[in-house]
């Protein structure tokens, strides 16, 4: 077999691999998992919101995270900090938690329907609030015109692009966990209007056990595949093969 034939074969295989990873998809199977913006500091689950004590836990850096299951549940965690142009010493910060169900329509629209009683928001505006931030319920249905999942050619990681209903892109997110790192997909803090169970203490105990179990079983941090390194490994193998062919 000639060197040119070997090189062509290996190059074709590498191009096929990279080309496949760069093709995008918008299926439920590809959407599954926990996605986080570039900093990776914001992740859905018990490290962002404690449903037992109803606490929003501030991450080290701002960011967004969305999680999806194959059977139609979602969770979102948002931490945003906005500068105050009039007074740089007074930035505002907001923490938002929601979870519920989602639906993908035939035209690719992604709709998130949160559980009305479970959403929480913590708003901090130090120049308007002398001491404490404002903690309140939060309920906002979200619609995305479309979404796309593919391997980012630069970072070599699975990437999720969400496009708002007006077509504007959200910050890109990267796969952090699959299956998703999420709180239980049931109503966490039911009210009387939401058909509250008779034994609330028992319900909270079940939620706590579920959270503890999710921390130790079935959830794995997604490893990063460096496709640039894979490409250069292939090139080096071609070069080594060429050298070996030359000295035969």
Curated annotation (Swiss-Prot):
**Is the Transmembrane keyword given for this protein?**
yes
Q: Where in the cell is it found?
A: Endoplasmic reticulum membrane
Provide Cytoplasmic-side residue ranges: 248
Q: Name the principal localization, coarsely classed.
A: endoplasmic reticulum
Positions of disulphide bridges: none
Segments passing through the bilayer: 230-247
The residues exposed to the Lumenal compartment are 24-229
**Sorted alphabetically, which keywords does the UniProt record give?**
Endoplasmic reticulum, Glycoprotein, Membrane, Signal, Transmembrane, Transmembrane helix
* PANTHER family in alphabetical order: PROTEIN ROT1 (PTHR28090:SF1)
User: In which family does this protein belong, per the annotation?
Assistant: Belongs to the ROT1 family.
- What is its biological role? Required for normal levels of the cell wall 1,6-beta-glucan. Involved in a protein folding machinery chaperoning proteins acting in various physiological processes including cell wall synthesis and lysis of autophagic bodies.
**What protein name applies here?**
Protein ROT1
Species for this entry: Yarrowia lipolytica (strain CLIB 122 / E 150)
């Amino acid at each position: 077999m000639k060197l040119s034939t070997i090189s062509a074969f290996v190059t074709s295989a590498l191009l096929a691999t990279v080309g496949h990873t760069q093709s995008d998809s918008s299926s439920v199977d590809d959407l599954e998992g926990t996605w986080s913006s570039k900093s990776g500091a914001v992740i859905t689950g018990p490290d962002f919101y404690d449903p037992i004590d109803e606490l929003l836990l501030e991450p080290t850096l701002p960011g967004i995270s969305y999680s999806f299951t194959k059977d139609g549940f979602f969770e979102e965690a948002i931490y945003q900090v906005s500068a105050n142009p009039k007074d740089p010493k007074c930035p505002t910060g907001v923490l938002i938690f929601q979870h519920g169900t989602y639906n993908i329509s035939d035209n690719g629209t992604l709709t998130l329907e949160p559980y009305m009683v479970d959403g929480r928001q913590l708003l901090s505006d130090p120049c308007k609030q002398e001491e404490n931030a404002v903690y309140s319920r939060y309920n906002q249905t979200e619609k995305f015109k479309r979404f796309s999942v593919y391997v980012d050619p630069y970072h070599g990681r699975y990437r999720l692009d969400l496009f708002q209903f007006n077509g504007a892109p959200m910050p890109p997110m990267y796969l952090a966990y699959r299956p998703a790192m999420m709180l239980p997909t049931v109503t966490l803090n039911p009210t009387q209007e939401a058909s509250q169970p008779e034994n609330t203490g028992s319900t909270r105990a079940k939620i706590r056990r579920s959270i503890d179990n999710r921390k130790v079983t079935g959830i794995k941090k997604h490893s990063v595949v460096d496709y640039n390194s894979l490409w250069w490994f292939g090139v080096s193998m071609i070069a080594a093969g060429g050298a070996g062919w030359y000295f035969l």
